């Protein structure tokens, strides 16, 4: 007698959220199984990969990364080049220089860059800010207004500014909004409830539940992802059924394994290869934990994770 495995799909299902417009639009979420459990049920939408484009990308030092973007001068130039990257599904514009404690770039300049990128590319666009609550609130609102009709995702609304960001981004301008918390299922659920309380539709919310480079407290991330996914699928908790997007690259490329020079750590080997390894490991860990999309940076890392996803779905 042959063995016939019993499929075990869950009663709950992750919301399907569409980003972008036209032929390049993507859908994240939509599954009713744990990550890559395709033996239990089909995953209708494979996890997606976004490419980070920072307005401080000229300071990136990895040789192959600099070579890939050689000749790029503006954010729109970087975006057009990133759109050709093998494995890329969407673009993430990261406005690091807007930080008032750093370069303090003006909101108007950032909006101009976002508009130039939107005119130059056809892939879906995700927006990341500078982590300053007041500056991000203004920046997100202005970009959401300028890119009306593009169906962008803004990362992210937080407990401190969810009313401002949720109301302007999702309600006033019809964009998708991220809900950002720090490795805590209860905080993630509470923020989703508060956004829905503003009448933001569940299918307009994407969670950013926190991440970290592997080896740097990632066990907290892993347990949070596991608990959120099990609550959403097994318990049908509608307040946790939003898809998850994990910004991997800022963490992976900021740890010592990626930043220590070969002169300082000769036994560790090639510095760029270390950074790629950290990014690949962190992205894979997030995806197997439950992330529906990851944001990455290096072409070699993106290509590796694309192959990883293709072989598992």
List the predicted regions and their residue ranges:
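Hydrophobic faces of well-ordered beta-strands that scaffold small-molecule active sites
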Residues: 47-53, 89-93, 123-129, 150-157, ...
């Amino acid at each position: 007698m042959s063995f016939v495995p019993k499929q075990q799909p869950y009663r709950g299902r992750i919301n399907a959220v569409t980003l972008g417009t036209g032929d390049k639009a993507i859908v994240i979420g939509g599954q009713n199984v744990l990550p890559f459990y395709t033996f239990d049920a089909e995953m209708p939408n494979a996890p997606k990969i976004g490419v980070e484009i920072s307005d401080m990308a000229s300071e990136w030092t990895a040789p192959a990364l600099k070579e890939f973007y050689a000749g790029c001068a503006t954010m729109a130039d970087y975006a057009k080049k990133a759109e050709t990257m093998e494995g890329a599904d969407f673009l993430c514009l990261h406005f690091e220089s807007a930080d008032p404690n750093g370069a303090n770039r003006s909101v108007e300049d950032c909006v101009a860059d976002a508009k130039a990128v939107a005119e130059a590319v056809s892939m879906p666009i995700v927006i990341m800010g500078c982590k300053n609550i007041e500056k991000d609130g203004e920046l997100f609102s202005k970009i959401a207004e300028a890119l009306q009709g593009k169906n962008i995702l803004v990362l992210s609304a937080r407990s401190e500014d969810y009313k401002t960001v949720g109301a302007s981004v999702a309600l006033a301008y019809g964009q998708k909004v991220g809900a950002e918390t720090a490795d805590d299922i209860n905080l993630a659920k509470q923020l989703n409830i508060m956004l829905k309380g503003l009448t933001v539709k569940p299918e307009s919310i994407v969670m950013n539940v926190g991440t970290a480079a592997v080896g740097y407290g990632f066990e907290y991330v892993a347990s949070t992802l596991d608990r959120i996914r099990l609550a959403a699928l097994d318990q049908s908790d509608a307040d946790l059924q939003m898809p998850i997007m994990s910004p991997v690259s800022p963490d992976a490329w900021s740890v010592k394994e990626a930043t220590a020079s070969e002169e300082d750590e000769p036994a560790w080997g090639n510095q760029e290869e270390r950074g790629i390894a950290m990014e690949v490991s962190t992205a894979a860990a997030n995806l197997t934990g439950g992330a529906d999309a990851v944001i990455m940076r290096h072409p070699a890392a993106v290509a590796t994770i694309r192959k990883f996803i293709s072989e598992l779905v």
